Amino acid sequence: MQGTISCARNYNMTTTVGESLRPLSLKTQGNGERVRMVVEENAVIVIGRRGCCMCHVVRRLLLGLGVNPAVLEIDEEREDEVLSELENIGVQGGGGTVKLPAVYVGGRLFGGLDRVMATHISGELVPILKEVGALWL
């Protein structure tokens, strides 16, 4: 079963619980604050284009590790606006240029699919996820 909610700017937010999806609350003041708040409130969030296969791969990997990532799917016409907001968050969090799919861990830009896969293969991903409270094992 899948559930999403739309906010004013056509961003759809979902968070996974096992194989089901439940909506996240997006009640904030401004449009830039909406994305910032969602990034800061979730231990792990995956942000990508609607229907992006790489976003799906990241999500499935994290689910396989026992992490329940929030997922932000954006429409192509809003992509530039969201990327601009994410780069502002990334600058404060020590990040840089944001490319989709983007994974934020502990409110900071972690990277994309390549970084997630590389840290998983090297065995560094699980300790990072434990450190931010996304895993309790």
Curated annotation (Swiss-Prot):
Q: What induces it?
A: Up-regulated by salicylic acid (SA).
Q: Where is this motif: Responsive for interaction with TGA factors?
A: 134-137
Task: Report the Pfam families cross-referenced here.
Answer: Glutaredoxin (PF00462)
Q: Where is the Glutaredoxin domain?
A: 32-136
Q: Which cysteines are joined by disulfide bonds?
A: C52-C55
Gene Ontology biological process terms from the UniProt entry = jasmonic acid mediated signaling pathway; negative regulation of transcription by RNA polymerase II; response to salicylic acid; salicylic acid mediated signaling pathway
Tell me the keywords, alphabetical order.
Cytoplasm, Disulfide bond, Electron transport, Nucleus, Redox-active center, Transport
Query: Where does it localize?
Result: Cytoplasm; Nucleus
Say if the entry is tagged with keyword Disulfide bond.
Answer: yes
Q: Name one GO cellular component term.
A: nucleus
Q: What does this protein do?
A: Has a glutathione-disulfide oxidoreductase activity in the presence of NADPH and glutathione reductase. Reduces low molecular weight disulfides and proteins.
Record protein name field: Glutaredoxin-C9
